[in-house]
From Swiss-Prot:
<dbReference type="InterPro" id="IPR028364">
    <property type="entry name" value="Ribosomal_uL1/biogenesis"/>
</dbReference>
<dbReference type="InterPro" id="IPR023674">
    <property type="entry name" value="Ribosomal_uL1-like"/>
</dbReference>
<dbReference type="GO" id="GO:0006417">
    <property type="term" value="P:regulation of translation"/>
</dbReference>
<keyword id="KW-0810">Translation regulation</keyword>
<dbReference type="GO" id="GO:0000049">
    <property type="term" value="F:tRNA binding"/>
</dbReference>
<dbReference type="GO" id="GO:0003735">
    <property type="term" value="F:structural constituent of ribosome"/>
</dbReference>
<comment type="function">
    <text>Binds directly to 23S rRNA. The L1 stalk is quite mobile in the ribosome, and is involved in E site tRNA release.</text>
</comment>
<keyword id="KW-0699">rRNA-binding</keyword>
<dbReference type="InterPro" id="IPR023673">
    <property type="entry name" value="Ribosomal_uL1_CS"/>
</dbReference>
<keyword id="KW-0820">tRNA-binding</keyword>
<keyword id="KW-0678">Repressor</keyword>
<keyword id="KW-0694">RNA-binding</keyword>
<dbReference type="GO" id="GO:0019843">
    <property type="term" value="F:rRNA binding"/>
</dbReference>
<dbReference type="Pfam" id="PF00687">
    <property type="entry name" value="Ribosomal_L1"/>
</dbReference>
<keyword id="KW-0687">Ribonucleoprotein</keyword>
<keyword id="KW-0689">Ribosomal protein</keyword>
<dbReference type="GO" id="GO:0022625">
    <property type="term" value="C:cytosolic large ribosomal subunit"/>
</dbReference>
Length: 237
């Protein structure tokens, strides 16, 4: 939905575009912008983090995963590539679909009714054949974010319990979900702090200059709210 119309303008009028808000103040303001839209839709709350990195260089890539303490508020559908005992573990842990070559074939035929993919290491030969399908959608399992693992049960629990995978895009910007607009401010802040703490710890040694260059939060139907990077650097160092 386009961010236009009277309700969006009313929400945007609450935000000083030239101000960098303290974190607590920023989330309180975000809740006010949601109220100004007066929609029954439970919007997603997002964060954009502008980093001083060039992801085109492998030694400057920022990538990771964090389990948000209060989850994302979203229902996550999990597909698992596994065989034998690990397939049974995946089913028992609540995976939405489990398979091997049969699942590969379904995906090649157009099945994409899932939000994340987990695989045991021995299945990566099968999963690798789906690179052109899963890769562009950000669904390819990766050991760096815990989606290539023998402990499929834990990976499934994490995925369904609020795990967020993130990576710096071409311009060095990390986009991630923090929860829903119905969340209490304290829960949104806690999720934000968990994510930012990890992003700051992942600063590449090869990154030069200012690492945290800008950060903003918004609801899916609301204006962006810029936050004070100095406060965040002091808190998360």
């Amino acid at each position: 939905m386009a961010k236009t119309g009277k309700k969006f303008r009313a929400a945007a009028a609450l935000v000083d575009r030239d101000k960098r808000y303290a974190v607590a103040e920023g989330f309180q303001l975000l809740k006010k912008t949601v109220e100004a839209r007066s929609t029954k839709y439970d919007q997603t709350v997002d964060v954009s983090i502008n980093l001083g990195v060039d992801p085109k260089h492998a030694d400057q890539m920022v990538r990771g995963a964090v389990v948000l303490p209060h989850g994302t508020g979203a229902t996550v559908r999990v597909a698992v590539f596994a065989k034998g005992e690990k397939a049974t573990d995946a089913t028992n842990a609540g995976a939405d679909v489990v398979g091997a070559e049969d699942l590969q074939k379904r995906i090649e035929e157009g099945f994409l009714d899932f939000d994340t993919v987990i695989a045991t290491p021995d299945m990566m030969g099968v999963v690798g054949r789906l690179g052109k399908v899963l890769g562009p959608r950000g669904l390819m399992p990766n050991p760096k974010v815990g989606t290539v693992t023998m402990d499929v049960a834990k990976a499934i629990r994490d995925a369904k319990g609020g795990k967020v995978d993130f990576r710096a895009e071409k311009a060095g910007i990390v986009h991630a979900k923090l929860g829903k607009s119905s969340f209490e401010v304290e829960k949104l802040e806690a999720n934000f702090n968990a994510l930012v703490d990890l992003v700051m710890k992942l600063k590449p040694a090869a990154a030069k200059g200012v690492y945290l260059q800008g950060i903003a939060i918004s609801s899916s139907m609301g204006p962006g709210i810029k936050l004070d990077t100095m406060e965040i650097k002091t808190r998360h160092g």
